[in-house]
Amino acid sequence: MARLCTHTESGHYLMALDAGTGSVRAVIFDLQGKQIAVGQAEWQHLAVPDVPGSMEFDLAKNWQLACQCIRQALQKAAIPATAIAAVSACSMRESIVIYDSNGEPIWACANVDARAAHEVSELKELHDNTFEEEVYRCSGQTLALSAIPRLLWLAHHRPDIYHRASTVTMISDWMAFMLSGELAVDPSNAGTTGLLDLVTRNWKRSLLQMAGLRSDILSPVKETGTLLGHISQKAAEQCDLQAGTPVIVGGGDVQLGCLGLGVVRPAQTAVLGGTFWQQVVNLPAPVTDPNMNVRINPHVIPGMVQTESISFFTGLTMRWFRDAFCAEEKLIAERLGIDAYSLLEDMASRVPPGAYGVMPIFSDVMRFKRWYHAAPSFINLSIDPEKCNKATLFRALEENAAIVSACNLQQIAAFSGVQADSLVFAGGGSKGKLWSQILADVTGLTVHVPVVKEATALGCAIAAGVGVGIWPSLAETGEKLVRWDREHKPNPENFAVYQQAREKWQAVYQDQRALVDGGLTTSLWKAPGL
């Protein structure tokens, strides 16, 4: 039997495994929350020939990459495996893994898998076209990203897998299973399947039964920060961790990211600026939006939920603009030894608020029930090169990202009654000082920017530490470990300018959506089933 190691005996560090959409990381932290070492590897998801929208998760290869990252992190930290007090895992949400009756993982898909568009449409017609509303009222999710249509797709197209299915989990749970041999899900990540009751934080089996699907494939539910099991001898040999090291239940990347940012109390608000931007508000009790515009997820803090709105491709749009139009600025930035975005922000800071009326049309506000966007474009350009140039367009894009965030926060306040009095801005976008100030000016809220801007792994490490008794609770530890880099106060004059810009943009965006509806332009993105 493997000997159990405890933090009081030898462990002075915690390991977080972070399975993102594009990469996997193993991150080691000390007991003060300082990052010590990281091992990282990119991974690619698999498009299946003749299956439009498919994006399968390569279980065998990706486990090898995870083990590689663990070994790399241990080597970089120059510590023995016995120094790791506990391990926990977090991941992109919506991704599911299916296991057979022997506990072998047999199929998985990534969060971006969109193969089940026909099944989404089929499910929406159930119960006199009310099934999706029933799913949303219970779980806070629509069918767009739910596991239900994916399972139905398997029943229709891969019955060999569907009939062998014994258990379903999320990617974070799969990583923990590969380490420990124990299967369970946590509410924060499993909540994104559309099968978890927000009130009970447990499965709602009747939703599967209503869809004509099996309800006997749901894993046990355990809360984030509780003991799942211990590193098995097999896993120890694969990844060089110490057999017997505790494996602690992790969770969804956004919720654990909020834990790492100290966003753990009711009404606290965060804007997470990455490839997608998420606007997250903590609610003290489960409640859903009557208009079904935003999703509601279980927080990792028991009893609390998070409203979450999503701005589509915000970070990706900025990267597209930089790469497509700013080759000169990239060269200059390289010579100066600075980031190209910093140079572009410096140029944009000389453009007045409002960007001379230029209106970017990219992501819409979130409309979860009928989720699609207008065709990408810039509206209200001029041919005056002094006013309409790269600096102006770059500033307009930063302003627009903040405007969409403000609109999404307004939607949340309208149905929940929870109004933010400040917000935390994290993720890659928060590195921009101009962008942070614009966000403050557009929302009218004080913006706090943390030192650790990518906090998901830290939140995961906090879960690991709480699970072995190093820290007393998730919320208390999240508040204790977060450190602040800077603060941005809103400028009242700029706020007034942006209020007018927001109203104009909302009106113009509706006209642009109508062009998509008429088949005249192509949407930036549409949810499956539309």
Curated annotation (Swiss-Prot):
GO terms for molecular function: autoinducer-2 kinase activity. It comes from the Bacteria. One of its GO terms (biological process) is carbohydrate metabolic process. Its EC number is 2.7.1.189. It is an enzyme of class 2 (transferase). Catalyzes the phosphorylation of autoinducer-2 (AI-2) to phospho-AI-2, which subsequently inactivates the transcriptional regulator LsrR and leads to the transcription of the lsr operon. Phosphorylates the ring-open form of (S)-4,5-dihydroxypentane-2,3-dione (DPD), which is the precursor to all AI-2 signaling molecules, at the C5 position. This is Autoinducer-2 kinase. It comes from Salmonella choleraesuis (strain SC-B67).
